[in-house]
Amino acid sequence: MNIETKYHGTVQLSQLALVSFENGLPGFEHEKQFALLPIHDSPFTILQSIQHKDVAFVMIEPFSYFPTYEIELDDATCEQLKIQKENDVALYVILTVAEPFTNTTANLQAPVVINVHERIGKQVILTNTPYKTKHRLFPETVEAK
């Protein structure tokens, strides 16, 4: 299957690259099918709608940048995503890419959870958590005066 993408041009996909989101993503409920497109030689992955090329999100696995990040999935989410064990799950967070890039932030409050075996996913909005929608990817640097 060939699709037009926002960042990669036209790409050929295998079924293994596709992920179904039963309810879409918040704000994009009509977008149900996405492709995971890793950016080679980088920690970034693009979550690309297969229907609309302009609907694409830059994501990372959070643990490299936020080593203490952890979440607990509720039973309903585990059931919906058919999660049996921890290694069924790939966890990503969506970035807001800024200029300069050092001002880029990660949404730790709403991770994207994917069952890698079933190829189904959901963006989970966490409540009662210290995480916010904008955590700096890179610590602020203090400039010399």
From Swiss-Prot:
Top-level taxon: Bacteria
Cross-referenced InterPro entries: Flagellar_assembly_factor_FliW, Flagellar_assmbl_FliW_dom_sf
Keywords: Bacterial flagellum biogenesis, Chaperone, Cytoplasm, Translation regulation
GO BP terms in the entry: bacterial-type flagellum assembly; regulation of translation
Intrachain S-S bonds: none
Pfam family, one: FliW
Listed transmembrane segments: none
HAMAP family in alphabetical order: FliW (MF_01185)
NCBIfam families: PRK13285.1-1 (NF009793)
Protein's name according to its UniProt entry: Flagellar assembly factor FliW
Organism in which the protein naturally occurs: Anoxybacillus flavithermus (strain DSM 21510 / WK1)
Upper taxonomic lineage: Bacteria, Bacillati, Bacillota, Bacilli, Bacillales
Gene field: fliW
